[in-house]
């Protein structure tokens, strides 16, 4: 049986000067894995609001399989501006849906059938999503062909030493950007 490649964490809207664009590194990871022909899945949470419905529609249009829990928080957004050098600056909204991804028996079953998962520090800024991500990682098979990819994201104040160290201990692949 083919195992999943999963992006777990934020699914959101990047609000750019030219308009809204679907965003979230884990969701993008799952989408691109699917484009390469892998069985992929995005795991996140959205609000029961227009932006959440539009994320589902976009994922459907792109053929991205997903598990998006509907939670009583607004769908996440990020206000993106460019500095004088053209480098993106991010204002990431807090206490949004992807901060509250609930753990479930369905996620545990997905973890047991997961070949690779990409998770980040950003989605671990809240206790609910951090605990869900850690339980998912712990439920994954511990084999040489299973990959736990940690996408470290040191934006704004949304990280702490304890979460970074814990994630280093759970991952076997580290992704780092220089922006």
Task: Describe the residue ranges of each PLM region.
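Ribokinase/PfkB-type carbohydrate-kinase core domain
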Residues: 2-6, 58-60, 66-68, 84-179
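Short beta-strand/turn micro-motifs composed of small residues
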Residues: 9, 44-46, 152
